[in-house]
Regions:
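Signature of N-terminal electron-transfer/Fe-S-associated modules in redox systems
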Residues: 1-130
């Protein structure tokens, strides 16, 4: 099968990569681009461990094809940290021991960032059903 050339913006940087037509964005991030912070949990889009932002929208990377990222802006957990250190969300996760084994944590942080960008002061119901 011929590999396809894709151009995207990943964590603020223009990237060009080759991927198979049926390769998930999760596999592209991890295997082609070396961005291993995004993890696979369930592989069916139910758990959110593989959450990324695509043009600011929360997406499960396991459900998106890599070729679909062409011309889009992708943000992963690696792109969330401030240049001078941790993003405030990452700091709060650490300070409040909001961690378990670590597989889901990157996705939780990405999803939390997406929530707070849309709802800066969410109530409990908004958080619960986000």
């Amino acid at each position: 099968m011929a590999r396809l050339q894709v151009e995207s913006t990943i964590n603020g940087e223009a990237k060009e990569f080759l991927c198979d037509a049926d390769q998930s964005m999760l596999d592209v991030l991890r295997d082609e681009l070396g961005l291993t912070g995004t993890k696979e949990g369930c592989g069916t889009g139910d758990c959110g461990a593989c959450s990324i932002l695509v043009d600011g929208r929360l997406v499960c990377a396991c459900l998106m094809l890599g070729v679909e990222s062409g011309g889009k802006s992708i943000e992963t957990i690696e792109g969330i940290a401030d240049k001078d250190g941790l993003h405030p969300l990452q700091r709060q996760f650490l300070e409040n021991a909001a961690l378990q084994c670590g597989i889901c944590t990157p996705g939780f942080i990405v999803a939390s960032k997406a929530l707070l960008e849309i709802h800066p002061d969410p109530d409990e119901e908004t958080i619960r059903y986000w």
